[in-house]
Amino acid sequence: MGVVMKYSLKLIIVVFIAVVIAACSSKPAEEYKAEAKKEVELKNYSKAVKIYDELADVHSGSKDASEALLEIAKLYHSKLVDSLDEKTSYKKAFSYYEKIYLEYQNSAEAPNALFMAAFLQGNELNNPEEAKKLYKLFIEKYPDSEMVNSAKMELENVGLTPEEILKKNTPQPKK
């Protein structure tokens, strides 16, 4: 029993030291942000995504992490990341928006992320049923948001062509 206890104690000490070293060696979030912004300015979008992703991993659960995830989503949504076709870029953007509203529900970025996820589903990924579900969730979760009226309007028009929306919203002449 004594040998097992000594071994267990040594293992606990080694793990503790490793955790402390890892925690101390991580860069501050501001340093990651500055590096990522520099890469965006240089139009090195893939590199910026990697830096923001690392920030989100290292500072997981923080405000900085949710902000970094939103920046990644916006880069993919804007189709700025090289070597991706449009649909793949939109799907990547959606996955980051989704991660924000699922894992960072109380963050300042969550309402915008949920709205944009719905918008992408309805307007870019041609999935009106998923868009409706997400717009309804947005309206339910964020009834006081300044974007709630936009969500309601999108919900009414999702899946319609521009011509159908115009026809629906234009008074028809009396016969």
Give the label of every model feature segment.
Residues 2-11, 20-175:
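Acidic, polar-rich low-complexity tracts and alpha-helical solenoid repeat scaffolds
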